[in-house]
């Protein structure tokens, strides 16, 4: 998939270089994945999360090849992961954002025969911090039978299931299924 820039953002030099030779970089990306991808240590940035009202340590994996590998793996695994996912799992899923969840809750409250008036929003305290590679791999083994893909998934998590890495939100949702 080609990178879509925000109209006011300056395109990243790495993205420009990759998109100038897409065929060459696709072949190179395939070689990297097939020959044993090794994740580089991500840069950790401390960011203020307005919605949660606290500081978060966000990992920033390198754009090439790390983020491209993350997206390539998830493109392949998305249909498999979506198959068993709850219809109302809204976190970080394309087409299922906060509005999707809010619309469902409003409908439930409106059409509930028992007259429910309230709903609850829950959060798992330090969820990403508590996820281990072993826990995620156990969940993935139930969904994925290809040993090579499982090996790539394990290599993605060399530094853990990090907030900020694209694959992390998908793997976290898989654990919650």
Regions found by a protein language model. Give the residues of each.
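Well-ordered mid-protein domain cores that form the structural environment of catalytic cofactors
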Residues: 70, 74, 78, 94-103, ...
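Non-catalytic, polymerase-adjacent accessory regions of viral genome-replication enzymes
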Residues: 1-31
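Short, glycine/acidic-rich hinge or "gate" loops at secondary-structure transitions
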Residues: 85-94
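Short acidic (Asp/Glu) and glycine-rich catalytic loops that position anionic groups and cofactors
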Residues: 2-11, 49-52, 81-85, 118
